[in-house]
Amino acid sequence: GYNGLPHLYVPVVTEPKQAASALQWAVSEMERRLKVFERLNVRKISTYNEKQAAGEFEHYDNPPQKMPYLVIIIDELSDLMMVAGKDVEASIVRIAQLGRAAGIHLIVATQRPSSNVVTGLIKANITNRIAFNVATGIDSRVIIDQMGAEKLTGLGDMLFSKVDWGKPRRIQGCFVSDDEINEIVEFVKSQSEPDYHEEILSAVAPASMSMAGGGGHCPHRSRRAARR
């Protein structure tokens, strides 16, 4: 499995409650970074890291550190939407709107492209989309706003829709075998040990879960995670 990869901030998350918490942590981290940028008069993470590396912030009492880029991969969105739909939707939308400047990016996937999973708000804010072969033209419309994906042949055949292209382009994904994936993962694992930040998984309890009796909101832990 992917656990043990040195670049992971947390172990692979399989519990929807923990995943929703991690998303809310990402929103807090994004907002923290943007406040730092505002205070230092920079607009985006690349400029910030260049200035930080050049020592331009050394005169501060507590000089800010280099910020890593973060990529959040959601392998199946429908599971999250069933558990904490409104909270997850709000987090995804917020990160999609402002995360790029802060170096926080989203890859969201689902095998159930229905309108209650890929909501209008999520679609409006995630404008670059890929559709593989789907069962119906309706499913295709949910993903790329037009029919066509139902006619794809499978095996990596896809339609890629980008906001500035006008219409989707048909492209072919490369096949990578399980053995090849495992070899690459094991090689990367051998290079270094991960430094997990597991408090992220319980830093914030989504509101809908708290009301249902799952975990409560812990302001101290939330602030501690947001400072990471």
Regions found by a protein language model. Name each.
Residues S21-R228:
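P-loop NTPase motor-domain active sites and their immediate coupling elements
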